[in-house]
Structures are given as structure tokens and as C-alpha cells.
Amino acid sequence: MVLETPVCSPIDKESSSDDVQLNKPPKKKRKLDVVYPPRDNTSSSSDVKPKVPGYCGVKAIGCNRSDELLAEVALHSYNSQTGTNLELMTVTQVMLQSVAHINYHMILDAFDPANNSLSSIEICLWDAAVKNNEKLRLVTTFCSLEGSGDKGSQWDPNGVDVLYTGVMPKWLDDGALSGSEKLHYYEVNDSDLQENKWLHLYAQVGAYSKWDLGMVKHFPLEIKKVVVQTMEDDIESNLKLKSSNAIFYITFTTSGGVECACIIRQTRNGRPQHMCLEINNVEMDK
């Protein structure tokens, strides 16, 4: 069995390879201040809750919005597998390697709203060569707390459920949600969109696939509809969003009112930290 991806482990800070570009800002002490609002005569101590101000950290030289988007994808993989809700604050280190495409090693600061704390996360994401008629393929193979001692491993395509392999699916048929296969689909409601903010990230990934860094000219995006499909017969509708393997059909509009659509196939191969997103853009009928 031949594995197609490099092994992605924690960043080798001593590497001096000529084909590695390291953007590393000087280290600074960082502190996340907690600001307490002033009390008034009617407030009790239990009414006062800390507010966390916007955190402005050190951004790596040369780090652009697409780098941050890829960091968010890897962080989403981490959150979905650990049950956390960490939010990207800033990318502090970027190292690029050319390995059958581009391999991103990053260190980022992530905020945990559960306890108002910052964590330093190491990630490795592969902007991989396409193979299933998709336009973009993003493979996360490492995402862990910095200094955890965890090691990365190669992406094993043979570990992916065969129901989610092969050529990318076409856009939904008109009767998909009411036909004989309707139990395989779930149309996401507004409360799901509010609760699962990563769906907005997936829409941005669709924009990145379509426009690359030019996506920022079309932000903010507004999601119009999301349908999630699972191939198994025994996954209830309200659990499809939590499925390790799923296909997302997303329509959204840009800030300029352009309506767009994308298909994102999300797969995992059973290895910790691993996730693959295959993305296609769909031309909407005029």
C-alpha cells in the first residue's frame, strides 16, 4: 500500500532545509486581560461576568487571509474531535513545504470561550493534489496543543468509508429531499446555523475554492441553504451534522449579491486528528 501524503508532525523549529520558508515573528509575552464592568447599586456579585476584549496578537509575516482560513479548517477538525469550541485569534507561525502541492505547518493562538483562556495549537494541513474531479482538496493530518508530544501520521485514503470515495457527487436533484432517498438528507435549519458556526466556515471554503485569495472581495457571505447528506441508513436527521463523513450542499450569496453554490465532501479515515475536505463549485442557473 502506497500512502500519498507526507508525515506531518509538530513543526521542526531547527529545520534549515532550502525548500522550507519560515515566517516567525519575535516572541512576545502575551496576556489576555479580563475586563470587569463597573458595578451599580443594583448589581450583585453573581451578576458580574467577565468580558473578554478583542485580542490582537502577533501575526506571522506573510500570513494572509487564506492562511488564516486554512488554520480555521484545521482548528475545526480539532474541535469536532475533542468536543471543544476553540476560536482562532491569530496565526503566530507559518512554515510552508512543497510536497506534491503545499504543506502548511502553523502555530496559532486559539481562544476558549468556556474559560476565557488562550491555547497555542500546532496544525498541519495539506493543500493536496486533486484526484476525484474536485477543484480543491484540503487534508488535515495534525492538530494538537503545542508541546503535547503528539506525532502526526500519513493520510491513509484506504481508511475512508467506501461510501464516500470516488468521483465527487453532482448537485442535488430537485426531488432529493422528498424522494425515496430522503432519509439520507437533512436540510439545516436556522438554529443549526447559529449553533454550528463552522458551516459558515465551509461556505468560506467554497468561496476560497472559487476565487482563491480574491474571496475577501466577496465577504461577508450569507448562507441561503445547507443540505447535509449521509450515505448510511441509520443516522438520524439531527445527528447528520455530527457525522464523521458527510456531504454538504451549500448555497450562499456574496456581499455583492452574487448567488453561489458548492459541494463539500467531508471524510475521516479513523486516525486521530485526520480530516479531508473535497470541494467543488457549482454554476447556478441564471
From Swiss-Prot:
Instruction: Fetch the PANTHER family from UniProt.
Output: BNAA09G28770D PROTEIN, CYSTATIN/MONELLIN SUPERFAMILY PROTEIN
Stored NCBIfam families: A_thl_para_3677 (TIGR01572)
Q: Which InterPro entries match?
A: Cystatin_sf, MS5
| Family named by the database record | Belongs to the UPF0725 (EMB2204) family.
Name of the protein this chain belongs to: UPF0725 protein At2g20620
Pfam families the record matches: protein_MS5
Top-rank taxon, per record: Eukaryota
Region of interest called Disordered, as start-end residue ranges on this chain? 1-49
